[in-house]
Regions:
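Interaction-mediating elements
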Residues: 1-124
C-alpha cells in the first residue's frame, strides 16, 4: 500500500532489516533502528496504530533511567520496551533484583509497578 510505505519511510528513515506482514486490512512492519527491534502496525491509509520497540537500559531516555534507578537502585534493568500508541508514549522497564523480578511502567513522569514476582528457590 503506497500510503503505508510513505508513512513508514517518513517515520523511520533509518530502518534496517525490514519485513512486512499483512493482517486483514492492516500492515505490520518488523525492523531494527538504533539497535532496537520494532513492531509497528499501520492502517491501510498509512496511519500508524502503534510502535512497540524492544531494547535495553542504554536505550532508555536519561530522565527515565534516573527516575527508575532512584527508586529501584538495587535492581538491574534487563529490558526497556517503548510503546507509542496515538498520543501516548510509555516505557515498560523490566528489572532483576537479588530475590525479585519487577516491571514498572513510566508515562508522563508517572511510574507504576505493574508486575513483581519472586525468583524460584533452587535446591542444589
Amino acid at each position: 500500500a503506497p500510503n503505508v510505505n510513505k508513512s513508514f519511510k517518513k517515520a523511520f528513515p533509518d530502518a534496517e532489516d525490514l519485513s512486512w506482514y499483512k493482517y486483514d486490512k492492516e500492515y505490520l512492519a518488523k525492523f531494527i533502528t538504533k539497535d532496537m527491534n520494532h513492531n509497528t502496525r499501520f492502517r491501510q491509509n498509512g496511519v500508524m496504530k502503534y510502535d512497540i520497540s524492544y531494547g535495553y537500559e542504554h536505550n532508555l531516555p536519561e530522565k527515565i533511567k534516573e527516575m527508575v534507578n532512584k527508586v529501584y537502585d538495587n535492581y538491574k534493568i534487563t529490558r526497556a520496551i517503548n510503546v507509542k500508541v496515538t498520543e501516548r508514549n510509555i516505557w515498560v522497564v523490566k528489572m532483576e533484583g537479588m530475590k525479585k523480578y519487577l516491571t514498572v511502567r513510566v508515562e508522563d513522569d508517572e511510574m507504576d509497578e505493574v508486575e513483581s514476582f519472586y525468583k524460584a528457590e533452587t535446591q542444589n
